[in-house]
């Protein structure tokens, strides 16, 4: 059985990635959420982009990949320009860069504090789930694909679009504590 470790921003991202992994790779996969820590489906340690970056170091990578076949690092880009994240989402002319360039800048940032030796050792075992803006954007195609295909391409205010759709079915995601 293959094993996949996760470094994610929060419990909702872990749930989404676990679902996607199971959907595409089947039941012969074991997912181990290492960041944030989880107990009985609830988040028990701090989350957010800062915690993901804090785990992007040689020791945490070694620990994760010593006992797992792969490591997926999930991070949203909605806070990438904040101090500490330090990824510029604009070019030298002040225009927002395209999604591919933003993705590459974020991956470079995630790997910044790792030694070249470690990167060589684990080449091919580190995967990235960089969410352009918010993870909730990944869910829009599941709900809007048939009735409003333009919503599927949204990258801003995704939680609001998703909640609007879910509220029609009397569901919703809490905006202040989406990890509950």
Model segments located where?
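Start-of-domain marker
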Residues: 42-46
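C-terminal accessory helical subdomains adjacent to catalytic cores in phosphodiester-
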Residues: 14-36, 40, 50-180
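Extreme N-terminal starter segment of soluble prokaryotic enzymes
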Residues: 1-5
